[in-house]
Amino acid sequence: MPGMPQKVIYPLMEQQYADEEKDLLEDEPLDSKTYDMENLKNKICELLDREKLYLNPEIRVSDIADRLFTNKNYVAQAIKSRMGKNFCQLIHYYRIKEAIRVYALNPDIQMNELAHRVGFNSMTTFNGAFSRNTGYTPAEWCKEYRRKNMDDYDS
């Protein structure tokens, strides 16, 4: 049975993530006294920094919730209320941060390999996330990075 083309699958997956986030955030507001959202936000960031769960292209809100022994509603609410992002935006932020780190260590890496290495399954999604998080396309950013490093080298 032939699979669906990536151009079809990945936008559908992103829509599924967005729909899941919307469903989670439409639940009754949680009482902030019962769970410290700022503390949870810090735990989410620590977990992502330490274990790099964002490298998994199939990561879900529930994966983080399970690791923190809480429920996905709390996680989604902490991300939205304390970081001003939805889950997908947060994961993309971490992936782009990692892409920049990897590129700095290996500036000869191909963009499709870099995108895959940091958890993106689609170049379209990678390019869009990169632009939203840096203000540059990946090609523009790489060109500027090389120029800056050459200027530093010449100094």
Model-derived regions: residue spans:
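Key DNA-contact positions within bacterial/archaeal DNA-binding proteins
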Residues: N73, M123-T124
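Residue-level detector of short coil/turn "hinge" positions at structural boundaries
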Residues: S122, T137-P138
